[in-house]
UniProtKB/Swiss-Prot annotation:
Lineage of the species this protein comes from: Bacteria, Pseudomonadati, Pseudomonadota, Gammaproteobacteria, Aeromonadales
UniProt enzyme class: ligase
Pfam families in the cross-refs: HGTP_anticodon (PF03129), tRNA-synt_His (PF13393)
Subunit details: Homodimer.
The protein's name: Histidine--tRNA ligase
Catalytically driven reaction(s): tRNA(His) + L-histidine + ATP = L-histidyl-tRNA(His) + AMP + diphosphate + H(+)
Predominant subcellular localization, coarse grouping: cytoplasm
GO biological process: histidyl-tRNA aminoacylation
Subcellular location: Cytoplasm
Keyword Transmembrane tagged: no
Length: 425
């Protein structure tokens, strides 16, 4: 027997039993972001490797360890996108979307990172992202956070999320702090773990994000970033906090919050939850005012966020917040007897034309009515329409309600639509 071919480790199928949850989440995301007036953009899943090296930073874990990179037949180095912001910025520069313009965009799709697969975190994962270009004030920072807060309310998980907030200051302020942090870390080098020692010179801010308790204890005595902020940074952060206070959105200022990518400045934020076991991030974002220029465009302020849909759906399932997801079939048409197959198929087409929101499935493959009714129940249809030879001859149809305590009735085909109209209510 030939060896069975299986999916690649960490890249999972989304089966028919799972897709209704995904569709519900994606529909909620689309509805909310559209209510803010944002437009969808779609980018390719493969980009030139140097895009991510320049955008994310060559000494980040993503670029050093996690990217799926390969050479194509022309010898070009290509990479499956590990995140969406870099590709979105590239597309906006290439097509002239951001020069002296304001843009508010969103996207959703698969991303790829060669990480150790674990629950809610996979090598192919799906990300919903929002990016805004051309706006500098704390008002747009607040709008994105308000948008995410609205998403949690719509999904019924607001009470299980906590907003963590920080500012990284300007690039000059961050550079000054970086030097001070390196000096401090050098004084404690022998006490740092191998990972922190590696990052100490290449990306010292990432040491602040360590999970090692011993290093965390050392960092309690490290210089703080706030000591290096000027008035502009302080005013921006104060303005953001005032807007969030006015909106009633609670937050925790976390001075150790730096995010995992090099391009952030000023505002950074994460939504975290304890509902997935150890505290985990379900959404993160921040400002990246220098990235457009860094990738070859004109200097353009920008801010965005992204959330992983696998972690979000896992959270919904864990908290049992998945409810009122409709079945995939409204009407199941059962047919048995001479001439009923044609009548059933034509009736189904008529219903799809006149009630396009109805999901109509016709039974195929023959079998008696008992077998067909079992199938109707298995697909969780709400109504079965039964066509026998008598019904076809008299241009009638028998209506059987499968989920409601309503008596079965036989009606003229012309009277069927008003009965089915209540399915859309």
């Amino acid at each position: 027997m030939a060896k069975q071919i299986q999916a690649i480790r960490g890249m999972n199928d989304c089966l028919p039993e799972q897709t209704p949850v995904w569709q519900m989440v994606e529909a909620t995301l689309r509805r909310v972001v559209s209510s803010y007036g944002y437009s969808e953009i779609r980018m390719p899943v493969v980009e030139m490797t140097n895009l991510f090296q320049r955008a994310i930073g060559e000494v980040t874990d993503v670029v050093e360890k996690e990217m799926y990179t390969f050479n194509d037949r022309n010898g070009d180095s290509l990479t499956l996108r590990p995140e969406g912001t870099a590709g979105c910025v590239r597309a906006c520069i290439e097509h002239g979307l951001v020069y002296n313009q304001e843009r508010r965009l969103w996207y959703v799709g698969p991303m790829f990172r060669h990480e150790r697969p674990q629950k809610g975190r996979y090598r192919q994962f799906h990300q919903f992202g929002v990016e805004v270009f051309g706006l500098t004030g704390p008002d747009i920072d607040a709008e994105l956070i308000m948008m995410t807060a609205r998403l949690w309310r719509e999904l019924g998980i607001a009470q299980f999320t906590t907003l963590q907030l920080n500012t990284l200051g300007s690039s000059a302020e961050r550079a000054a702090y970086r030097d001070a942090l390196v000096t401090f870390l050098e004084q404690h080098k022998e006490s740092l773990d191998e990972e922190s020692q590696r990052r100490m010179y290449s990306n010292p801010l990432r040491v602040l994000d360590t999970k090692n308790p011993q290093v965390q204890e050392i960092l309690q005595h490290a210089p703080t970033m706030a000591d290096y902020f000027g008035e502009e940074t302080k005013a921006h952060f104060s303005g953001l906090k005032a807007l969030l206070d006015a909106a009633g959105i609670a937050y925790q200022v976390n001075e150790r919050l730096v995010r995992g990518l090099d391009y952030y400045n000023y505002t950074v934020f994460e939504w975290v939850t304890d509902s997935l076991g150890a505290q985990g991030t379900i959404c993160g974002g921040g400002r990246y005012d220098g990235l457009v220029e860094q990738l070859g465009g004109q200097a353009t302020p920008a801010i965005g966020f992204a959330m992983g849909l696998e972690r979000l759906t896992l959270m919904l399932e864990t908290l049992e917040q998945i409810r009122n997801i409709p079945s995939t079939v409204d009407v199941y048409i059962c047919m048995a007897g001479e001439g009923t197959l044609t009548a059933g198929l034509l009736l189904a087409e008529k219903l799809r034309s006149e009630r396009p929101q109805l999901r109509v499935m016709t039974h195929c493959g023959g079998g008696n009515f008992k077998k067909q009714m079992k199938r109707a129940d298995k697909v969780e249809a709400r109504i079965a329409l039964i066509l026998g030879e008598t019904e076809v001859a008299e241009q009638k149809v028998t209506v059987k309600f499968l989920r409601d305590q309503v008596e079965q009735q036989t009606v003229d085909v012309t009277a069927l639509l008003p009965i089915l109209a209540q399915l859309g209510e």
